[in-house]
Amino acid sequence: LFNSFLKTDEFIKVFEGTLWAEGPCYIPHKDMLVWSDNPNNRMMKLVDDQVSEFRNPSNFCNGNTIDNEENLISCSHGGRCVYKTDDNINVSVVVDRFEGKKFNSPNDICVKSDDTIWFTDPPYGILSDYEGYKGEQEYEGCYVFRFNPHTQKLDVMTKNLDRPNGIAFSHDEKKLYIADTGENVQCLYVFDVLNDKIINQKLVYDFKPFFSDGFRSDKDGNIWTSAGKAVKCFNPNNELIGQILVPEL
């Protein structure tokens, strides 16, 4: 069954030279792949099989996605905010405060069909100057947020994770997956989505000694996630159905 998803077993190296390759995001109307090279403080792009810089400096952007108008939506460690980049590469701040306090360092992000923006906020970008700017946490904890760009309303979705990291909806948006990459927790969890809330947190997989970082859902509801030496695939029943070993770690 798993092999039926794979059209090829060939790896194609798109680019070599990033310190960390994070947040790959495809922008359909541009036929362009964008990703972050976080410690190098830049973003890269792939167009017509050619790689070049998309933005430098990027203010230490990390996770990326697109909104429903195919604008690029990015988490910025350096800005401690969420950015929107339009077709002309104009960058604007979407949201940068929680109750008047700076975010920690928004890490990963997804956009729902109702235009709401969901993102995780661990402190990795403020722990040192390596992937952001060393700074202090201004609120206690590491939350998962939901921002409505139409009403400008920001809501906390959960406070119950140690270091929330990767985040993605299932294809039907009935489930929300969130990775926790805390010191003693390297797990992927799934929540049921009920209106504007998430409930019924369940464990999908414990990845120790590795962890699940970025992931996305396919149209069949399978979750494809980075996980140490492999890309692992879980079906909608949270069962591991296969993995692809990668040649580089």
Q: Could you describe each region identified by the protein language model?
A:
Residues 12-13, 52-57, 92-96, 155-158, ...:
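Beta-propeller fold detector
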Residues 184-192, 197-239:
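Loop/turn-rich, solvent-exposed surfaces of beta-rich toroidal or solenoidal domains
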Residues 46-50, 86-90, 148-152, 192-196, ...:
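Short loop/turn segments that connect beta-strands within beta-propeller blades
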Residues 16-31, 57-76, 80-81, 99-117, ...:
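Beta-rich, blade/repeat-based domains predominating
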Residues 1-12, 29, 40, 138-141:
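Blade/loop signatures of beta-propeller domains
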Residues 38-39, 77-78, 126-141, 181-186:
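Short, solvent-exposed loop/turn segments at conserved positions within beta-propeller repeat blades
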Residues 42-44, 81-83, 143-145, 187-189, ...:
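A short loop-to-beta-strand structural motif that recurs across blades of beta-propeller domains
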Residues 1-19, 46-49, 201-203:
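A short helix->beta-strand "capping" segment at the edge of beta-propeller domains
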